[in-house]
């Protein structure tokens, strides 16, 4: 519940209030007592006591008309649509929605310890590590790209890396109702670009890495813009953990100089001194030897990042050790074995840098023929297509099958051809993803060989023309073709 007086107070304090406009009359205050028992940005979810946020580049007046027909009596907007109900006009609808939602749900962020991860890759894996560390002796909720849990028991698929602010604070409130003590979440650059976490301060923020990604017409116009929005997490955290090996580390180091911080990686006090496939040793604040199920040094680095963050939240080294040992992540370096002994690696690697690291791990263990099944999504991250080509060109013996991966409103054949145009040798294009995986499974001969299925991980859908069409998921499809 929230009153109109409280809403106006919030907006005025944030210098985000213009006026209330109704029948061409302007109001700075509203004398009538009005209380809202629901918030919505979806015109299909409206009742008479709902406050509606008219937001988005594609918003149309007919959506507002539909909401008014359903009983809407007030809305918030940057634009006066000339409707027959009062409008609260603001300078920034996204800022307004975040702060009003925060208050509506009784500031649940103050009742949870908040841990956030950002970075081009590794956010989900690091979040899972932190979740398992905290779970040993606490009650953490988690919002991740892969799965969300608000009670530690039931899990559901997330639609956005970071939810819309209204949904985010509703989820936090549910976690509080479920007596959760901590919230682990991923914070994307888009979350700051679209102000989904506006006004939110995290107890610990972690910056894992940065490389060019999410650059395109509907995302970030430049790498500078992408990097800037990533760094906003540092300014909005009470303590930070940063990878000292990341590109452009010096600017981040300077930015966090006066914030309590830990660095990890080479040239820092928290460093891996021994790395085996399923164990590693750390010097520094986390000094110990750790067992780990996820292979690859980059996963060990993600574990250190999560461990340092949890240490700042009061988690013991023993709980950190147990958490790392227990962590698995759906769609992250999942391994199957064909009857001929060849390995199938299913991984979410979905940009050039993560593909590069995935190939390095597989090539370290598999010395025979390696087949890569790969695609790129439509209508986003267009720079990935060239990046994939550049990485593939560094592996001349790699056999490549290009296929569909969430083509959305683009033609998957055109996407595959664009990737192929950046590759310096012939590749195979099989648009049907299951057919591509089936074909790859026929190309191995012995235990030294491997198939890498990259991009979708555990996602059991294909995004086609704005819809999530059913797809079994790469792991389930690969299981069908183990006989070789």
UniProtKB/Swiss-Prot annotation:
Residue window of motif L-lysine recognition motif: 405-408
The protein's enzyme class: ligase
InterPro entries: Mur-like_cat_sf, Mur_ligase_C, Mur_ligase_C_dom_sf, Mur_ligase_cen, MurE/MurF_N, UDP-N-AcMur-Glu-dNH2Pim_ligase
Protein name: UDP-N-acetylmuramoyl-L-alanyl-D-glutamate--L-lysine ligase
SUPFAM superfamilies: MurD-like peptide ligases, catalytic domain, MurD-like peptide ligases, peptide-binding domain, MurE/MurF N-terminal domain
Modified residues (N6-carboxylysine): 230
Family named by the database record: Belongs to the MurCDEF family. MurE subfamily.
Annotated Gene3D superfamilies: Mur ligase, C-terminal domain (3.90.190.20), Mur-like, catalytic domain (3.40.1190.10), MurE/MurF, N-terminal domain (3.40.1390.10)
Catalytic reaction annotation: UDP-N-acetyl-alpha-D-muramoyl-L-alanyl-D-glutamate + L-lysine + ATP = UDP-N-acetyl-alpha-D-muramoyl-L-alanyl-gamma-D-glutamyl-L-lysine + ADP + phosphate + H(+)
GO terms for cellular component: cytoplasm
Binding sites annotated in the UniProt record for ATP: 119-125
A molecular-function term among this protein's GO annotations: ATP binding
Keywords: ATP-binding, Cell cycle, Cell division, Cell shape, Cell wall biogenesis/degradation, Cytoplasm, Ligase, Nucleotide-binding, Peptidoglycan synthesis
Pfam families: Mur_ligase_C, Mur_ligase_M
Binding site for UDP-N-acetyl-alpha-D-muramoyl-L-alanyl-D-glutamate: 43, 161-162, 188, 196
Biological role: Catalyzes the addition of L-lysine to the nucleotide precursor UDP-N-acetylmuramoyl-L-alanyl-D-glutamate (UMAG) in the biosynthesis of bacterial cell-wall peptidoglycan.
PTM summary: Carboxylation is probably crucial for Mg(2+) binding and, consequently, for the gamma-phosphate positioning of ATP.
EC numbers: 6.3.2.7
Pathway the protein contributes to: Cell wall biogenesis; peptidoglycan biosynthesis
Subcellular location: Cytoplasm
Gene Ontology terms describing biological process: cell division; cell wall organization; peptidoglycan biosynthetic process; regulation of cell shape
């Amino acid at each position: 519940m929230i009153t109109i007086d409280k809403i106006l107070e919030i907006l005025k304090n944030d210098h985000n209030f213009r006026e209330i406009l109704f029948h061409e009359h302007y109001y700075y205050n509203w004398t009538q007592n009005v209380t809202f028992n629901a918030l919505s940005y979806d015109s299909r979810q409206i009742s008479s006591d709902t406050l509606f946020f008219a937001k988005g580049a594609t918003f149309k007046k007919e959506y507002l008309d539909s909401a008014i027909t359903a009983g809407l009596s007030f809305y918030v907007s940057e634009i006066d649509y000339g409707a027959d109900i009062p409008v609260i006009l603001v300078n920034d609808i996204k800022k307004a929605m975040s702060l009003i939602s925060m208050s509506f749900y009784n500031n649940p962020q103050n009742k949870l310890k908040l841990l956030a991860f950002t970075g081009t890759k590794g956010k989900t894996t690091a979040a899972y590590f932190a979740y398992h560390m905290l779970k040993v002796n606490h009650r953490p909720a988690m919002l991740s790209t892969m799965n969300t849990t608000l009670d530690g028991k039931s899990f559901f698929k997330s639609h956005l890396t970071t939810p819309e602010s209204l949904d985010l604070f509703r989820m936090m409130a549910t976690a509080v109702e479920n007596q959760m003590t901590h919230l682990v979440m991923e914070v994307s650059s888009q979350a700051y670009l679209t102000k989904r976490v506006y006004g939110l301060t995290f107890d610990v923020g972690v910056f894992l890495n940065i490389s060019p990604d999410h650059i395109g017409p509907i995302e970030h116009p430049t790498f500078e813009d992408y990097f800037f929005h990533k760094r906003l997490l540092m300014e909005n955290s009470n303590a930070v953990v940063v990878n000292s090996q990341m590109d452009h580390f010096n600017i981040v180091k300077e930015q966090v100089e006066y914030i309590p911080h830990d660095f990890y990686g080479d040239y820092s006090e928290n460093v891996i001194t021994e790395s085996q496939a399923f164990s590693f040793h750390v010097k520094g604040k986390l000094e110990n030897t750790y067992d780990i199920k996820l292979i690859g040094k980059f996963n060990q680095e993600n574990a250190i990042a999560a461990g340092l963050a949890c240490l700042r939240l009061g988690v013991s080294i023993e709980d950190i050790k147990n958490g790392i040992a227990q962590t698995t992540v759906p769609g992250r370096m999942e391994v199957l074995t064909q009857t001929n002994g060849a390995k199938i690696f299913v991984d979410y690697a979905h940009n050039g840098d993560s593909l590069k690291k995935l190939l390095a791990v597989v090539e370290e263990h598999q010395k025979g023929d390696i087949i890569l099944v790969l695609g790129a999504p439509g209508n986003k991250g267009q720079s990935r297509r060239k990046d994939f080509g550049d990485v593939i060109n560094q592996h001349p013996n790699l056999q490549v099958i290009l296929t569909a991966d969430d083509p959305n409103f683009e033609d998957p054949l055109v996407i595959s051809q664009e990737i192929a145009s950046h590759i310096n040798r012939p590749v195979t294009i099989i648009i049907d993803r299951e057919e591509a995986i089936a074909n790859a499974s026929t190309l191995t001969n012995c235990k030294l060989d491997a198939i890498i299925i990259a991009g979708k991980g555990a996602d059991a859908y294909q995004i086609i023309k704005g819809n999530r069409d059913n797809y079994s998921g790469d792991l389930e499809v690969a299981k069908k073709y183990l006989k070789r």
